[in-house]
Amino acid sequence: EKLLLKDIDEIAKRYSLKDHAKNPSYLYHNGKPLVTVWGVGFNDNRSYGLNEAEYIIDGLKSQGFSVMLGVPTQWRKLEGDTESDPRLHELIRKCDILMPWFVGRYNETTYPKYQKLVEEDIQWAKKNLVDYAPLVYPGFSWGNMKGKEHNSFIPRNKGSFLWKQLMGAIRAGA
């Protein structure tokens, strides 16, 4: 964790990340350069946990960064793909933006169930003063990574799948 924080500090200085005028192409949130900490709170026995994530988030915030946190789909209820530790919610509240993982969780037909989840997630985020960035995706296929014989895919449906997610997130207040 210390090495990561040292690296981001050096990168920020080298590339003037904290000076929007010198680095206008970098992404900023509320006037601060944005850094994402991804994969926090999953219950799949990762080699890091909430303690390490908190150390990194606290360090990034103290260095003047805005932080987006990438979390599991079921983060709010602390079930399913998410570890059951309520400290995850405390950690989310320390961040500026929340982005749950949804890739592969639904297709165009099953999306309405998840749209309701997104609506409730946005309500929680607003109540807890955390911005919410909905993760939307155009479709998915394992074909490029696992070969053509692998037939697990989520069709793009000529863009209608992506648009359904975008419109659902906007209507929910994202």
Listing of model-derived features with the role each one plays in the protein:
Residues 1-174:
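Glycan-processing catalytic domains of CAZymes
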